[in-house]
């Protein structure tokens, strides 16, 4: 739920802007903050109040999936589905983190894609480049939520690491809401790897 008189977390990021954002899913407000590395993270939200536990999605940037409609992953459909679900619920938020490629960056992600074209799976491709299988940190997401007074969420995720990451940084996860969408022939192996080797609940 949203605690309106909750003190802001220490070292909260600077708020750069907050404005109305009409979308195909419905009207949101978008709030952009800048972290201490200069990365801009966004919070897309609607209907936040002090009595309802909001439906929340933590979504890491995926240019290829979110913008280009790549079929190699399920990121684009997950983002759209989250926006639709939050509008239907009437209360929720999407934290959009600039953690492209599970935290390795766009350039490295495309290099990993090239290795996947040669037969490696999504995990082994990262490791072959000397990079972590998943380098994301959810402290950023927790701080953005706490800044808005949100300390308890219903989390749309298939990834237990997101649940644990939020809990470690002061966010109570009231409920995990499964978030399976966008499954197809092109990303079947990718999703199987996430389930079998990375602990995702698929």
Which residues fall in each region the model found?
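Catalytic domains of riboflavin
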Residues: 1-202
């Amino acid at each position: 739920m949203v605690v309106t008189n909750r003190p802001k977390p220490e070292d909260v990021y600077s708020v750069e802007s907050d404005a109305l954002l009409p979308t195909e899913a419905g009207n949101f407000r978008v709030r952009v903050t800048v972290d201490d590395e200069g990365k801009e993270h966004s919070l897309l939200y609607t209907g936040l109040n002090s009595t309802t536990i909001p439906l929340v999605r933590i979504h890491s940037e995926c240019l290829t999936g979110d913008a280009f409609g790549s079929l190699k992953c399920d990121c684009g459909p997950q983002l759209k589905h989250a926006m639709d679900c939050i509008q239907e619920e009437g209360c929720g938020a999407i934290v959009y983190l600039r953690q492209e490629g599970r935290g390795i960056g766009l350039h490295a992600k495309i290099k990993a894609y090239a290795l996947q074209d040669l037969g490696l799976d999504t995990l082994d491709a990262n490791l072959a480049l000397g990079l972590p299988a998943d380098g994301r940190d959810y402290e950023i997401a927790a701080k953005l939520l706490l800044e808005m007074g949100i300390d308890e969420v219903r989390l749309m995720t298939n990834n237990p690491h997101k649940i644990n990451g939020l809990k470690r940084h002061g966010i109570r996860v009231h409920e995990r809401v499964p978030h399976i969408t966008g499954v197809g022939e092109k990303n079947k192996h990718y999703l199987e790897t996430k389930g079998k080797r990375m602990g995702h609940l698929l």
